Amino acid sequence: MKRAFILVLDSFGIGATADAQAFGDVGSDTLGHIADQCAQGLADNAERKGALQLPNLSKLGLAMAHKESTGRFAPGLDERADIIGAYAHAAELSSGKDTPSGHWEIAGVPVLFEWGYFSDKQNSFPKELTDRILARAGLDGFLGNCHASGTQVLDDLGEEHMRTGKPIFYTSADSVFQIACHEETFGLARLLELCQIAREELADYNIGRVIARPFVGPGKGQFARTGNRRDLSVEPPSATVLQKLVEEKQGRVVSIGKIADIYAYCGITDKVKATGIPDLFEATLEQIKQAGDNTIVFTNFVDFDSAYGHRRDVAGYAAALEYFDKRLPEVLALMQEDDILILTADHGCDPTWPGTDHTREHIPVLVYGKKVAPGSLGRRDTFADIGQTLASYFGTSPMDYGKNFL
């Protein structure tokens, strides 16, 4: 019975890539810098203290993959762990360092074209675009029109939004158009309708995602995003390994978290909603228990990126990693004879790095299975090696990019 479980620790980079200079990210290292700050006592909070402790990830080869990427061991990680999995560090072939590019490449389809971007920090959006969106939505104005941190923009504009009913439009260094609205005063359904209008009006701009950012709270300092985020992505430019499994093998692909949104529902047969790392983990365990032959269970743990990476919260990121690590044996205990588990990431988001954007880094590729030989798989030239490996494993037609590493 063929089953594969892909767990994406969103933003968990393990050291800058050779092309990081083009992105302003030379020296970035999400894992290494978190470990450094933990070792120095600079990442203590109510949940954790001291050196970074990731014994189970280290057994799967995380410490070794990081060393092969950066030339050094991350302090606190067990460099003498008995390795039980295959491990690698992978570079990105895609032109960007964004979520769709990383995920599509993982599934065998790198993004070799250039996304459209809203590069101006202020007055970011063309007036003709926003005029069309507002007219179709029956709105008389909007707030923002800038690059912004998703949490800061709520403090800056949330109260005015509640008072005026004007949505908050903002963007970032990624190919995104983001809309933040209060779930209670503006309405969630209305926000999602507005995002659909924006998605349609952005057809000629080559923007990767429109993101609905609903929030709640009475006022500044008390606003909080909810779990009802939606990502409206464009479709991948060609068939991913997910689509091939479904179409060629009549297989199942179970999306947990925002996976379905990222792939614009292409190649997704089942969607499980869960928010927050504990709930995402529980949903993953439940779906592994239920999974039959020719099934991929695919989970994105977005909080590593959204709650800790972008917010530059080193202690929070470290605590979340340690929580994930402690629960990892629960996944391993459910593995059957022919199963494959792949732990990976889609880009970096170094919480010690200037700004709030992603970082261009290698991703870990940690592979475990009872029939997987432990040891180094070296440096992989593209995330698409994961997709090609899955294509070979499930017996679908091969992908155009990537090499099978098993």
From Swiss-Prot:
Q: Which GO terms describe its molecular function?
A: magnesium ion binding; manganese ion binding; phosphopentomutase activity
Q: What is its EC number?
A: 5.4.2.7
Where, per UniProt, does this protein localize?
Answer: Cytoplasm
Secreted in keyword set? no
Where are the coiled-coil regions?
none
- Name the positions where Mn(2+) 2 binds: 305, 310, 358
Q: Does the keyword Glycoprotein apply?
A: no
A cellular component term from Gene Ontology for this protein is: cytosol
Q: In which pathway does it act?
A: Carbohydrate degradation; 2-deoxy-D-ribose 1-phosphate degradation; D-glyceraldehyde 3-phosphate and acetaldehyde from 2-deoxy-alpha-D-ribose 1-phosphate: step 1/2
Task: State the UniProt keywords alphabetically.
Answer: Cytoplasm, Isomerase, Manganese, Metal-binding
- What this protein is called in its record is Phosphopentomutase
